[in-house]
Amino acid sequence: MYEVDARGLSCPQPLMLTNEALKTQKGAFKVLVSEPHQKTNVEKFAKDKGKKVTVKAVGSEFELIIE
């Protein structure tokens, strides 16, 4: 599965990387973020684009599967 590693990046970089993946990836992909507000922003952004989002906490970080 394609993976966007946005851990440690400042906003709006996680959203920009997610948007690029939405444009280029045909199937599901994973986004990794390190901050709760990044998780919230990426999740809302993907849902606003009509995507299904599954969120999982991995330690102090987050994994979002976007389909």
Which residues fall in each region the model found?
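Iron-sulfur (Fe-S) cluster-binding modules
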Residues: 23, 49, 64-66
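An N-terminal amphipathic alpha-helical segment
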Residues: 1-25
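Amphipathic alpha-helical interaction surfaces in cytosolic regulatory modules
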Residues: 13-20, 36-49
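Short glycine-rich, basic-tinged beta-strand/loop micro-motifs
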Residues: 22-34
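A generic structural signal for beta-strand entry/edge sites
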Residues: 1, 28, 59-63
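C-terminal edge-of-domain segments
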Residues: 53-67
